Amino acid sequence: NNSPKPTEEMWNAPVMMEFKHNTGLKESIGVITEDAPIGSRTITASLTGVSAGSWVCLVLGTPELGNTNDDVINSELSPYRWQDIKVQQGTTPNIKTNGIQIFEYHQIEKISGNSVTFKEPIMHAINKDWGWNVHKFANYANVGVEDLTFKGHAKEKFIHHGSDIDDGGFKLIDFVRLTNSW
């Protein structure tokens, strides 16, 4: 167990090896100005500082705050609605209070004017009126770990929240903000 406080913070063991690009999504580099259906590979946006091969993140809401628009939330919950969520009387569900955030990561295949084509299809329908933004996605690429063996002594009987060993006493490898990596 490599946790500094194994009995107080059972889930909080430090990572032994971490491969991480330390920048976040930062500020928006453009706004999506036209609707795009789910499965499309092309969006319309005037972007700065990117070109073919660059990685970007389509963001609904902000990296800090979610979008609290009823239509946005209900589209994500469909066929359900946030208004139908049962909560204690007088309270509002967290999904309405905090809103939703969507982050889609894509690699740009080509840019022609304001038309941006990705190497893969988008996974959400884009409604231009909902405030979709494009952020640059800084990352490391082609990071890999091979021919590495971790050997330990597994507990005979797992008990959820039973001890620090049950709840994350070991975190061996963490990959954060990497692309085309293994």
Give residue ranges: language-model regions.
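Extracellular/periplasmic carbohydrate-active domains that bind, remodel
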Residues: 1-182
